[in-house]
Amino acid sequence: MASRQDRREARAEADARRAAEEIARARDERVMQAEVDARSAADEIARARADRGAATMGADTAHHAAAGGGILESVQEGAKSFVSAVGRTFGGARDTAAEKTSQTADATRDKLGEYKDYTADKARETNDSVARKTNETADATRDKLGEYKDYTADKTQETKDAVAQKASDASEATKNKLGEYKDALARKTRDAKDTTAQKATEFKDGVKATAQETRDATKDTTQTAADKARETAATHDDATDKGQGQGLLGALGNVTGAIKEKLTVSPAATQEHLGGGEERAVKERAAEKAASVYFEEKDRLTRERAAERVDKCVEKCVEGCPDATCAHRHGKM
């Protein structure tokens, strides 16, 4: 900024010098032109007076010779005096112009000095104002930064507190939800346990009922098998005595069919009880037991019938029984 001010002052000084030089040059030219004009006027006056003096000279040339020479000299002296006066006048004007030019230059220098001092003062004031404004701006900036820093710290703390509060609320809500879920799960577990126990009790009761029915059916079947075996044996004996019938195996087949009929459970009865697999297992065990009883009874009856036949054969035969089925003919006695 100072260099720009210096350049402005230098330009002002140069302009002032050029103006003073122009003024001096113009005044010198006017003075010189005035001198030339004065000399020309003096010459014209001298020629006019010379011509007028020559016209009046006539008859008395001799008388007026001395006087004429004096007039010419007088005219020449007058012209010289006029030229000197004009010279002095224009010389004074030139001196006055030079003095005025000098005064103008001095005034210009004074004005330039004053302007330079004024410019320097203004520059100092401007610098001081700029420095003051800069300091004020820096102070305001620092204040704003401090306020912003405090505001940011407050907002950060508020955000941190809000986040902590939200986290605490979320934790409490999660705990409450977990407690509710745990209670609901425990309640569901108790309900499921009670339902399972109830179903198990119902199943157990159903199995017991089915087992009891199966035992009853097995008992009935066993009794029926025994009755059928006895009836079959009696029928076989009658048929043997009469030479008719299908024999012991046919009778046993009838007994087997009766056992199957007794052990067969209708689909409606099957659907009345729980646990189809357990029921089938119980029924299978009951059927096996019934079959075992059946075959034991069969063997027992077979042995009894064989013993009875042998006894009858012994009673009827002395030397031997003609019947091919007689046991003693085969070495079984």
UniProtKB/Swiss-Prot annotation:
Region (Disordered): 1-20, 116-246
Domain of life, source organism: Eukaryota
GO BP annotation list: cold acclimation
Segments crossing the lipid bilayer: none
Keyword list, A-Z: Coiled coil
Coiled-coil positions: 3-52
Chain intervals with Basic and acidic residues compositional bias: 116-163, 172-219, 227-241
Inducing or repressing factors: In seedling leaves, by salt stress.
A GO term from the CC aspect: cytosol
Family designation: Belongs to the LEA type 4 family.
Protein name, per record: Late embryogenesis abundant protein 1
Species this chain originates from: Oryza sativa subsp. indica (Rice)
